[in-house]
Amino acid sequence: MSQQNGNVNRVGAQDRVGASGGMEHSFGFKAVDENEKQGLVNDVFHKVAKRYDIMNDLMSAGMHRVWKDAMVAWLAPSKRPGWTSLDVAGGTGDIAFRIVEASGRQAHVTILDINGSMLGVGRERAIKKGLIDNLEFVEANAEELPFEDNSFDAYTIAFGIRNVPHIDKALSEAYRVLKPGGRFLCLEFSEVELPVLDKVYDEWSFRAIPRIGKMITGDADSYSYLVESIRKFPKQQDFAAMIEKAGFERVSYRNFTGGIAALHSGWKL
């Protein structure tokens, strides 16, 4: 589909990838060698780490806070001592903090991120919130998790999986490190399914967000990448198929705000 008269053009390199993958060759709408992508993504998040909350507010018009609350509510963390969760691409701690609080401060959450700048922000926030004793911070790659098989009761990832070059590898690793009976939850920007809202959100995303990002941070390019990466990410049904292919069962998803974001769930049974 292409749109004319100054509207967003979404053809070719701008089409979403399917259930067979392909994100490893795209940096936003730019075609890149798969060996380059991780470094390019790392550069983006080094730049935005200190203003990550502002970035999410721009991308979601502030709704990411509501969606994250809903994610943790659906997870329903156990309040029994010893319950463990792995939050991947969770550097600044938004999901992990919510999980610890929802568990009555019983849960132990490992926050894993490939980006040290993001983890640094998360540690500072955890100390200020008095949650540091419930948390562990690990700098590592989602495609090669440094944990034994069957290690965690839950695996969460919010607004991070679209930045992983090989999504299939990340999903396989998620399955591997979960205990039998463990839960996978992924919150990600997705395909807007409501007529009119999709066009409004496109205009906001492609026209306004990079400009506002430049005004606030002096960096328009990082925000352009983040917007473009959303448009490349698989549709809800295609991503659900990828989760099933990794071995998960009872896979389902919920749309938020007309599909601007979707929350996917799966179980290791």
From Swiss-Prot:
Q: What EC number is given for this enzyme?
A: 2.1.1.163, 2.1.1.201
Q: Which organism's genome codes for this protein?
A: Brucella abortus (strain 2308)
Q: Which UniProt keywords apply?
A: Menaquinone biosynthesis, Methyltransferase, S-adenosyl-L-methionine, Transferase, Ubiquinone biosynthesis
Q: Kindly provide the name given to this protein in its UniProt entry.
A: Ubiquinone/menaquinone biosynthesis C-methyltransferase UbiE
Q: Where does S-adenosyl-L-methionine bind?
A: T92, D113, N141, A142
- List, in alphabetical order, the Gene Ontology terms for molecular function in this entry: 2-methoxy-6-polyprenyl-1,4-benzoquinol methyltransferase activity; demethylmenaquinone methyltransferase activity
Q: What is the lineage of its organism?
A: Bacteria, Pseudomonadati, Pseudomonadota, Alphaproteobacteria, Hyphomicrobiales
Q: Its pathway?
A: Quinol/quinone metabolism; menaquinone biosynthesis; menaquinol from 1,4-dihydroxy-2-naphthoate: step 2/2; Cofactor biosynthesis; ubiquinone biosynthesis
So what does this one do?
Answer: Methyltransferase required for the conversion of demethylmenaquinol (DMKH2) to menaquinol (MKH2) and the conversion of 2-polyprenyl-6-methoxy-1,4-benzoquinol (DDMQH2) to 2-polyprenyl-3-methyl-6-methoxy-1,4-benzoquinol (DMQH2).
Q: Per its UniProt record, what Gene3D superfamilies does this chain match?
A: Vaccinia Virus protein VP39 (3.40.50.150)
Q: Which GO terms describe its biological process?
A: aerobic respiration; menaquinone biosynthetic process; methylation
Tell me the InterPro entries matching this sequence: SAM-dependent_MTases_sf, UbiE/COQ5_MeTrFase, UbiE/COQ5_MeTrFase_CS
To which protein family does this belong? Belongs to the class I-like SAM-binding methyltransferase superfamily. MenG/UbiE family.
Reactions it catalyzes: a 2-demethylmenaquinol + S-adenosyl-L-methionine = a menaquinol + S-adenosyl-L-homocysteine + H(+); a 2-methoxy-6-(all-trans-polyprenyl)benzene-1,4-diol + S-adenosyl-L-methionine = a 5-methoxy-2-methyl-3-(all-trans-polyprenyl)benzene-1,4-diol + S-adenosyl-L-homocysteine + H(+)
